[in-house]
Amino acid sequence: MLGLHGRKPAQVIVEPVAKLMIKLKVTPNQLTLVSAGLTVGVALLLIPTGHLIWAAVLTGLFAAFDMIDGTVARMQGGGTKFGATLDATCDRITDGALFGAITWWLVYSYDAPQALVAASLVCLVASQVISYVKARGEASGFTMDGGLVERPERLIVSLVGLGLTGMGVPYAIDVALWALAAGSIYTVVQRLVMAGKSPLAKEFTKAPAGAKADYSNTK
Protein backbone atom coordinates (compact mmCIF):
# COMPACT_ATOMS: atom_id res chain seq x y z
CA MET A 1 0.00 0.00 0.00
CA LEU A 2 2.71 2.49 0.98
CA GLY A 3 4.83 1.09 -1.81
CA LEU A 4 2.50 2.71 -4.32
CA HIS A 5 1.90 6.03 -2.56
CA GLY A 6 4.96 6.65 -0.39
CA ARG A 7 7.72 6.81 -2.98
CA LYS A 8 7.27 10.42 -4.14
CA PRO A 9 7.52 12.03 -0.67
CA ALA A 10 10.49 9.81 0.18
CA GLN A 11 12.35 10.87 -2.97
CA VAL A 12 12.98 14.28 -1.40
CA ILE A 13 15.41 12.55 0.97
CA VAL A 14 16.47 9.63 -1.18
CA GLU A 15 17.49 11.46 -4.37
CA PRO A 16 20.29 13.59 -2.82
CA VAL A 17 21.74 10.48 -1.18
CA ALA A 18 21.49 8.59 -4.46
CA LYS A 19 23.34 11.39 -6.28
CA LEU A 20 26.10 11.19 -3.67
CA MET A 21 26.36 7.42 -4.17
CA ILE A 22 26.73 7.95 -7.92
CA LYS A 23 29.52 10.47 -7.35
CA LEU A 24 31.26 7.95 -5.10
CA LYS A 25 30.83 5.33 -7.85
CA VAL A 26 28.85 3.01 -5.61
CA THR A 27 26.77 0.61 -7.71
CA PRO A 28 23.12 -0.30 -7.02
CA ASN A 29 24.09 -3.94 -6.41
CA GLN A 30 26.71 -2.90 -3.87
CA LEU A 31 24.10 -0.82 -2.06
CA THR A 32 21.70 -3.76 -2.07
CA LEU A 33 24.26 -6.12 -0.55
CA VAL A 34 25.50 -3.63 2.06
CA SER A 35 21.94 -2.74 3.08
CA ALA A 36 20.95 -6.40 3.40
CA GLY A 37 24.09 -7.34 5.31
CA LEU A 38 23.74 -4.50 7.80
CA THR A 39 20.01 -5.08 8.27
CA VAL A 40 20.45 -8.80 8.91
CA GLY A 41 23.42 -8.20 11.21
CA VAL A 42 21.62 -5.61 13.32
CA ALA A 43 18.44 -7.68 13.55
CA LEU A 44 20.21 -10.87 14.60
CA LEU A 45 22.58 -9.17 17.05
CA LEU A 46 20.38 -6.58 18.73
CA ILE A 47 16.85 -8.00 18.83
CA PRO A 48 17.59 -11.35 20.55
CA THR A 49 19.74 -9.54 23.13
CA GLY A 50 16.92 -7.11 23.97
CA HIS A 51 18.41 -3.89 22.55
CA LEU A 52 15.07 -3.10 20.97
CA ILE A 53 15.28 0.68 20.55
CA TRP A 54 18.63 0.54 18.80
CA ALA A 55 17.44 -2.44 16.78
CA ALA A 56 14.38 -0.53 15.58
CA VAL A 57 16.32 2.63 14.70
CA LEU A 58 19.25 0.95 12.95
CA THR A 59 17.20 -1.68 11.15
CA GLY A 60 14.91 1.03 9.82
CA LEU A 61 17.87 3.15 8.75
CA PHE A 62 19.66 0.34 6.93
CA ALA A 63 16.46 -0.98 5.37
CA ALA A 64 15.90 2.49 3.90
CA PHE A 65 18.91 1.87 1.66
CA ASP A 66 16.58 -0.47 -0.22
CA MET A 67 15.04 2.65 -1.76
CA ILE A 68 18.41 4.20 -2.59
CA ASP A 69 19.68 1.34 -4.75
CA GLY A 70 16.63 1.53 -7.01
CA THR A 71 16.93 5.31 -7.30
CA VAL A 72 20.62 5.04 -8.20
CA ALA A 73 19.74 2.48 -10.88
CA ARG A 74 17.04 4.72 -12.39
CA MET A 75 19.35 7.75 -12.38
CA GLN A 76 21.89 5.71 -14.32
CA GLY A 77 19.39 4.73 -16.98
CA GLY A 78 17.61 1.80 -15.37
CA GLY A 79 18.49 -1.29 -13.39
CA THR A 80 19.38 -4.73 -14.71
CA LYS A 81 17.31 -7.90 -14.46
CA PHE A 82 20.00 -9.42 -12.25
CA GLY A 83 19.88 -6.35 -10.01
CA ALA A 84 16.12 -6.74 -9.60
CA THR A 85 16.55 -10.44 -8.78
CA LEU A 86 19.30 -9.67 -6.27
CA ASP A 87 17.20 -6.95 -4.64
CA ALA A 88 14.15 -9.21 -4.30
CA THR A 89 16.29 -12.01 -2.87
CA CYS A 90 17.88 -9.72 -0.28
CA ASP A 91 14.45 -8.39 0.70
CA ARG A 92 13.28 -11.92 1.46
CA ILE A 93 16.44 -12.61 3.50
CA THR A 94 16.08 -9.43 5.56
CA ASP A 95 12.38 -10.03 6.20
CA GLY A 96 13.15 -13.56 7.36
CA ALA A 97 15.99 -12.38 9.60
CA LEU A 98 13.83 -9.67 11.17
CA PHE A 99 10.89 -11.88 12.08
CA GLY A 100 13.17 -14.79 12.95
CA ALA A 101 15.01 -12.54 15.41
CA ILE A 102 11.73 -11.25 16.85
CA THR A 103 10.50 -14.82 17.32
CA TRP A 104 13.78 -15.79 19.01
CA TRP A 105 13.46 -12.84 21.41
CA LEU A 106 9.80 -13.64 22.14
CA VAL A 107 10.66 -17.20 23.12
CA TYR A 108 13.84 -16.66 25.13
CA SER A 109 13.55 -13.13 26.56
CA TYR A 110 9.97 -11.86 26.45
CA ASP A 111 8.35 -14.98 27.93
CA ALA A 112 5.64 -14.59 25.32
CA PRO A 113 2.55 -16.81 25.23
CA GLN A 114 2.53 -19.47 22.53
CA ALA A 115 -0.18 -17.64 20.61
CA LEU A 116 2.03 -14.56 20.19
CA VAL A 117 4.96 -16.71 19.05
CA ALA A 118 2.61 -18.28 16.51
CA ALA A 119 1.58 -14.81 15.31
CA SER A 120 5.23 -13.92 14.81
CA LEU A 121 5.78 -17.10 12.80
CA VAL A 122 2.73 -16.26 10.70
CA CYS A 123 4.33 -12.88 9.96
CA LEU A 124 7.58 -14.61 8.98
CA VAL A 125 5.94 -17.09 6.61
CA ALA A 126 3.41 -14.63 5.21
CA SER A 127 6.14 -12.09 4.42
CA GLN A 128 7.59 -14.65 2.01
CA VAL A 129 4.25 -15.84 0.61
CA ILE A 130 2.96 -12.32 -0.08
CA SER A 131 6.00 -11.57 -2.19
CA TYR A 132 5.91 -14.97 -3.90
CA VAL A 133 2.26 -14.62 -4.93
CA LYS A 134 3.06 -11.26 -6.52
CA ALA A 135 6.17 -12.56 -8.30
CA ARG A 136 4.43 -15.71 -9.55
CA GLY A 137 1.40 -13.74 -10.66
CA GLU A 138 3.48 -11.21 -12.57
CA ALA A 139 5.44 -14.06 -14.18
CA SER A 140 2.08 -15.36 -15.43
CA GLY A 141 1.27 -11.96 -16.91
CA PHE A 142 -1.14 -10.79 -14.20
CA THR A 143 -1.24 -7.22 -12.92
CA MET A 144 -0.45 -7.53 -9.20
CA ASP A 145 -0.19 -3.94 -7.99
CA GLY A 146 -0.96 -3.07 -4.39
CA GLY A 147 -1.97 -5.00 -1.30
CA LEU A 148 -2.93 -4.14 2.26
CA VAL A 149 0.35 -5.20 3.90
CA GLU A 150 3.46 -4.91 1.75
CA ARG A 151 7.10 -4.71 2.80
CA PRO A 152 7.04 -1.04 3.93
CA GLU A 153 4.06 -1.73 6.20
CA ARG A 154 5.73 -4.83 7.65
CA LEU A 155 8.88 -2.91 8.46
CA ILE A 156 7.15 0.15 9.90
CA VAL A 157 4.66 -1.72 12.10
CA SER A 158 7.16 -4.29 13.39
CA LEU A 159 9.91 -1.76 14.09
CA VAL A 160 7.54 0.70 15.78
CA GLY A 161 6.27 -2.16 17.93
CA LEU A 162 9.83 -3.11 18.85
CA GLY A 163 10.84 0.47 19.60
CA LEU A 164 7.81 1.17 21.78
CA THR A 165 8.36 -2.09 23.65
CA GLY A 166 11.95 -1.02 24.27
CA MET A 167 10.59 2.23 25.73
CA GLY A 168 8.41 0.28 28.12
CA VAL A 169 5.04 0.64 26.37
CA PRO A 170 3.07 -2.47 27.39
CA TYR A 171 1.76 -4.84 24.71
CA ALA A 172 3.22 -2.75 21.87
CA ILE A 173 4.89 -5.70 20.16
CA ASP A 174 1.81 -7.84 20.83
CA VAL A 175 -0.47 -5.40 19.01
CA ALA A 176 2.03 -4.96 16.18
CA LEU A 177 2.43 -8.69 15.55
CA TRP A 178 -1.26 -9.53 15.76
CA ALA A 179 -2.10 -6.66 13.40
CA LEU A 180 0.59 -7.77 10.96
CA ALA A 181 -0.44 -11.42 11.15
CA ALA A 182 -4.08 -10.62 10.40
CA GLY A 183 -3.19 -8.09 7.72
CA SER A 184 -0.68 -10.44 6.09
CA ILE A 185 -3.16 -13.31 5.85
CA TYR A 186 -5.67 -10.90 4.33
CA THR A 187 -3.06 -9.72 1.81
CA VAL A 188 -2.25 -13.27 0.68
CA VAL A 189 -5.96 -13.89 0.03
CA GLN A 190 -6.31 -10.44 -1.56
CA ARG A 191 -3.53 -11.14 -4.05
CA LEU A 192 -4.83 -14.61 -4.88
CA VAL A 193 -8.25 -13.10 -5.59
CA MET A 194 -6.53 -10.43 -7.69
CA ALA A 195 -4.80 -13.16 -9.70
CA GLY A 196 -8.00 -15.18 -10.03
CA LYS A 197 -9.87 -12.20 -11.47
CA SER A 198 -7.23 -11.48 -14.10
CA PRO A 199 -8.37 -11.90 -17.73
CA LEU A 200 -5.44 -14.31 -18.14
CA ALA A 201 -6.32 -16.45 -15.13
CA LYS A 202 -7.95 -19.29 -17.08
CA GLU A 203 -5.28 -19.58 -19.75
CA PHE A 204 -3.53 -22.95 -19.80
CA THR A 205 0.12 -23.19 -18.84
CA LYS A 206 2.75 -25.03 -20.85
CA ALA A 207 3.72 -28.50 -19.69
CA PRO A 208 7.09 -28.75 -17.91
CA ALA A 209 10.05 -29.82 -20.01
CA GLY A 210 9.94 -33.58 -20.57
CA ALA A 211 6.30 -33.95 -19.49
CA LYS A 212 3.61 -35.23 -21.83
CA ALA A 213 1.54 -32.29 -23.00
CA ASP A 214 -1.44 -34.03 -24.63
CA TYR A 215 -3.44 -36.80 -22.92
CA SER A 216 -6.46 -36.52 -25.22
CA ASN A 217 -5.74 -39.91 -26.82
CA THR A 218 -5.02 -41.69 -23.56
CA LYS A 219 -7.45 -44.54 -22.85
Curated annotation (Swiss-Prot):
Binding residues for Mg(2+) 2: 66, 87, 91
InterPro entries hit by this protein: CDP-OH_P_trans, CDP-OH_PTrfase_TM_dom, CDP_ALCOHOL_P_TRANSF_CS, PIP_synthase_PgsA1
Predominant location: membrane
NADP among keywords: no
GO molecular function per UniProt: magnesium ion binding; phosphotransferase activity, for other substituted phosphate groups
Binding residue positions for Mg(2+) 1: 66, 69, 87
Pathway connected to this protein: Phospholipid metabolism; phosphatidylinositol phosphate biosynthesis
Transmembrane segments: 31-47, 53-72, 93-110, 116-133, 154-171, 177-194
Cofactor: Mg(2+)
Protein name: Phosphatidylinositol phosphate synthase
Recorded catalytic activity of this chain's protein: a CDP-1,2-diacyl-sn-glycerol + 1D-myo-inositol 3-phosphate = a 1,2-diacyl-sn-glycero-3-phospho-(1D-myo-inositol-3-phosphate) + CMP + H(+); 1,2-di-(9Z-octadecenoyl)-sn-glycero-3-cytidine-5'-diphosphate + 1D-myo-inositol 3-phosphate = 1,2-di-(9Z-octadecenoyl)-sn-glycero-3-phospho-(1D-myo-inositol-3-phosphate) + CMP + H(+)
Cofactor note: Contains a di-nuclear catalytic Mg(2+) center.
Active site residues per record: 91 (proton acceptor)
Keywords, ordered alphabetically: Cell membrane, Lipid biosynthesis, Lipid metabolism, Magnesium, Membrane, Metal-binding, Phospholipid biosynthesis, Phospholipid metabolism, Transferase, Transmembrane, Transmembrane helix
Compartment(s): Cell membrane
Entries under NCBIfam families matching the protein: PIPSynth (NF045883)
EC numbers on record: 2.7.8.-
Family classification: Belongs to the CDP-alcohol phosphatidyltransferase class-I family.
UniProt entry tagged with the keyword Disulfide bond: no
Membrane topology: Multi-pass membrane protein
Classification lineage: Bacteria, Bacillati, Actinomycetota, Actinomycetes, Mycobacteriales
One Gene Ontology CC term in the entry: plasma membrane
